[in-house]
Amino acid sequence: MSDIEARVRKIVAEKLNVDEEKVTNTSTFVDELGADSLDTVELVMALEDEFQCEIGDEAAEKMTSVQHAIDYIKSNAKC
């Protein structure tokens, strides 16, 4: 697991109040981890803080799983 993956999974576990072992790259925020719309906004904000980047609204809406978050951060040089 890469450093980015580990950091994303840790943030997801903390923000969604789930055990880190239950957070996999394929976990979806809403369906599998029980996030609501406020949780997802807070999660995106935490990712922005951790990786010192800005995640636009359109990208945030498409970010529905742990892997989507990891891919976005890896593919954006700002992160």
Swiss-Prot record:
Record's comment on post-translational modification: 4'-phosphopantetheine is transferred from CoA to a specific serine of apo-ACP by AcpS. This modification is essential for activity because fatty acids are bound in thioester linkage to the sulfhydryl of the prosthetic group.
Query: Gene of origin?
Result: acpP
Family in the record: Belongs to the acyl carrier protein (ACP) family.
- What species is given as this protein's source? Xylella fastidiosa (strain Temecula1 / ATCC 700964)
Highest taxon of the lineage? Bacteria
- Name used for this protein in its record: Acyl carrier protein
| Carrier domain span | 2-77
Q: Which InterPro entries does the protein's record reference?
A: ACP (IPR003231), ACP-like_sf (IPR036736), PP-bd_ACP (IPR009081), Ppantetheine_attach_site (IPR006162)
| UniProt pathway annotation | Lipid metabolism; fatty acid biosynthesis
One GO BP on record is:
lipid A biosynthetic process
- GO MF: acyl binding; acyl carrier activity
Q: Which cysteines are joined by disulfide bonds?
A: none
